[in-house]
Amino acid sequence: MALTPEQISYRQQLVAMGDFNAHTLLPGEEWTRPENADVRHVLSLIPLTDIQLANRLDVDERTIRKWKSGETSMVFTTWCCLCWLAGLGMLLEEPA
């Protein structure tokens, strides 16, 4: 499924703010691992508590805290899920 116009606009606004790495929104091999600030920003866009998000992703709540602090890095598939939950579209799909 292609990105909606709303998702495209949302991504553009996020990147235009200047404190978000657009390369974290690229699919597959082109993807750049998000920095701590990118992770915190995307997590702040998700309308779930840390406990709810941990349950949704089947991870421990401590893992969410470690992502926020930068103590633990994130794999691509988890980042895809977070971006999807934040309304940024699904990164697993190749652009049209």
Task: Describe the residue ranges of each PLM region.
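Short alpha-helical DNA-recognition segment
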Residues: 47-63
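N-terminal flexible/basic segments that precede or flank functional cores
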Residues: 1-33
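DNA major-groove recognition helix of helix-turn-helix/homeodomain DNA-binding modules
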Residues: 73-94
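Charged, low-complexity surface patches
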Residues: 32, 42-43, 71
